[in-house]
Amino acid sequence: MHRIHLYNNLERRKDVSIPVYQCICDRWKRGDSVRLLARETGRSVHEVQRMVADHQTHLLYDGVERIIDRMHQSILHQDLSLPPIVYHEKADPSSHKMRTIGVESIEQQLYDEVADYALQPLKKRIGTYQIACLKGKGGAMGNRALRRWMRDKRVRWAVQADVKKCYESIDRKKLMGFLRHVVKGSPRVLWLIETLISTHRHGLNIGCKLSQDLVNIYLSVLYHQLTEQVAVVQKRRGETKKHMAVCHALFQMDDILLLCTSKRDAKLAVKALLEKSAELGITIKPSWRMYELNDPSVRGEGKTFVDIIGVRFYRHRRSLRRRVYIRARRGLAKVQRLIRMHKRVPSSLAKRVISHVGCLLWTEHFRLWKKYKVTKTLRVCKEVISHESKILYPAGHR
């Protein structure tokens, strides 16, 4: 395995200042950031809020510089003290699953940003179609790729699997062993990462940016194993031919999709998936599926489909999942009703509709688009969000 030099051992002050400013500039209005800057600058919370509202954040840079100095010294001396993470249970609005979310202090979020910035060279290991939580990728990239792959008639079999408790099941010892194996030098970066993830209750913390990138980097081992190492050798009439068992792979964080040309290749891919995941210390749910895309027992062309990233991909069309479609239709109808009654559209409803319209852009639901005047509805919702973002809330507001 090729080792990567990070070129950033957090020795220089700018290795800390650049990510800290990137993090703070995205969080000026947040209550925890306001309280931290008020404490560092000796001002009141109300004064800091007023400076942010008047776009005078340059007056707070002296407090940011003090934070950077303190963080840099704590990293150099490897002496880190952080407030405990606060955990709470939250129901996932789409799947209704209960998830344990850890809310980190703003200080730990800054250290996460520093560690994540130092890991930039290691992110090159992440596979091309590992699309979750990565800038420039996401559902749009996965949608374009799957639309292209499904039109290829050579792709006949699909394998779908899911990692059980992806964040919480990550073995921190194996993760750090992997990082020490692939990272050349940079002991301070490894110490900082190990110290930060040791504060998590089980495995890695859900809702932490550093956790997202560490999971993507760790699962890249599985991605490259399946797409580059699982080969099929065919011998016929004295000729030897070799091809990869997996012709296309898509990882949406813990959701795995493998596309193959034959049932034999699909079985080989499943075997490699289960073996490599066990080696990495992660568990694949027993509900994994292997199915034929051109199933002759299903009448009609295009009746079999791939269901991932909230969209059903048929051979020559795409549609939303039923429950997503119903929610999108209800949200659009509610906004249309409020517009006709000349009533205010709540910001929560506007955000939900904008999200659903983003999914509709990937599909061929033209009748829905025309019936609910989606273009006009989207413009109204964007105006609501734009107005909402200009309101300055108190420091403790959520």
Feature map (PLM): residue ranges:
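Active-site-proximal segment of RNA-dependent polymerases
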Residues: 111-171
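Short, conserved non-catalytic motifs in the polymerase core
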Residues: 53-55, 83-110, 126-137, 197-217, ...
